[in-house]
């Protein structure tokens, strides 16, 4: 499961030099001719990764994907990131709220559903991912899962 950041970098004639991104693609220190920098529209970065964090996946399915669990790419707005961060911080501060605020989910690919050390490690990881993402004012965020 991934949180990706897409930044629009397409250059237009009407942009000032300060607004333009410079895209350079090299391999082994040499320019890659097969990728034309002028045609690059987006840079996509993996800013978060979860492995078997079923509670986090369930939150995205319920709150971002309208209950549809289909391994698609889903836009995540800033307020959704802030909400998930708030929920994670509440669960971290008071473990007794975990089952109510961020319930685990069962499934073939998810591992255990216990509220144990692994569950709370996922909470810490998520807090770190979201705090970093929310510090950055550029780009759009997308959640995707794959099995």
Question: What kind of region is each of these model predictions?
Answer:
Residues 1-147:
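Acidic (Asp/Glu-rich) sequence patches and key acidic residues
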């Amino acid at each position: 499961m991934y949180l990706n950041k897409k930044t629009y970098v397409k250059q237009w004639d009407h942009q000032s030099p300060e607004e333009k991104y410079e895209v350079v693609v090299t391999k082994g220190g040499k320019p890659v001719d097969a990728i034309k920098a002028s045609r690059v529209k987006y840079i996509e970065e993996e800013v978060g990764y979860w492995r078997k964090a079923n509670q986090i996946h369930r939150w995205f399915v319920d709150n971002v994907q309208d209950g549809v669990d289909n391994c698609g790419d889903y836009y995540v707005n800033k307020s959704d990131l802030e909400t998930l961060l708030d929920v994670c911080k509440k669960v971290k501060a008071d473990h007794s709220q975990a089952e109510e605020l961020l319930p685990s989910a069962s499934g073939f690919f998810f591992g255990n559903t216990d509220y144990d050390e692994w569950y709370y490690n996922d909470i810490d990881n998520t807090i770190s991912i979201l705090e970093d993402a929310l510090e950055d004012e550029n780009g759009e965020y997308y959640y995707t899962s794959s099995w």
